[in-house]
A protein has these predicted regions:
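Generic beta-sheet signal
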Residues: 38-40, 146-154
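A short, acidic, amphipathic alpha-helical segment used as a generic capping/interface helix at domain edges
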Residues: 134-144
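Sec/Tat signal peptide C-region and signal peptidase I cleavage site
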Residues: 18-23
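Positively charged n-region of N-terminal signal peptides that target proteins for export
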Residues: 1-5
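Bacterial N-terminal signal peptides
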Residues: 7-17
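A short, structured loop/turn motif at beta-sheet edges
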Residues: 143-148, 177-178
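Active-site-proximal alpha-helix that buttresses catalytic centers in soluble enzyme cores
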Residues: 25-115, 123-127, 135, 165-191
Length: 191
């Protein structure tokens, strides 16, 4: 029962958060930070219909058992990657949650070699590991010291746990690297 209440709460928060409009200032700040380099871009995977979480009995190592990207999600991911390239934004490293919808989003962005990172795994599904995963993600962001940017494709609940922002599908929240606070500096919702 407790798990169901938690899932409903996270779902409601997610719906509230996706109704937010990304303002021009937040987008301008995000572009400026990414052009300067040394930041982390936390991206929620592109559109993956079918509800919340994953179907019962899903396995991380079997995409057929998970929620996957829709055709719209696949097209959106490719468009977002093209837009980032057009704007001259590059990433030194691209990390992804091990969930297929995140890996597929990262690959369709076509912004570099994609490496899976378990600490960005879905904190809703792995709720018993939420604190450890979030702490690991904060540490990973804090460790980033590249002159370029780090891109992490993960889940909305993970971005929210790190930043307090519940992003829309495909939305990018840019945070300062080198700090374990994952402080947001801007947001991009590209179409």
């Amino acid at each position: 029962m407790r798990g169901i209440r938690f899932a409903i709460l996270v779902l409601l928060i997610g719906f509230c958060g996706t109704a937010e409009v990304v303002g021009a200032d937040a987008a301008a700040d995000a572009w400026k930070a990414l052009r300067a380099g040394g930041h982390t871009a936390l991206m929620r995977h592109a559109d993956a219909p079918g509800g919340f979480g994953d179907p019962p009995g899903f396995r991380v190592d079997d995409c057929a058992t998970q929620r996957n990207l829709s055709e719209k999600g696949r097209a959106d991911a490719a468009k977002i990657g093209a837009r980032l390239k057009l704007e001259g934004i590059a990433f030194e490293q691209v990390l992804s949650s091990p969930w297929c919808r995140c890996i597929d989003t990262a690959m369709l962005l076509n912004l570099g070699t994609v490496e899976t990172e378990v600490t960005f795994g879905n904190v809703v599904v792995l709720r018993d590991q939420r604190e450890a995963l979030t702490a690991g993600a904060r540490a990973r962001i804090a460790q980033w010291s590249g002159r370029g940017n780090l891109l992490v494709v993960t889940h909305g609940a993970n971005v929210q746990a790190l930043t307090g922002i519940s992003p829309a599908s495909g939305e990018i929240v840019v945070v300062k690297s080198g700090s374990d606070r994952a402080e947001p500096v801007g947001r991009l919702l590209l179409d």
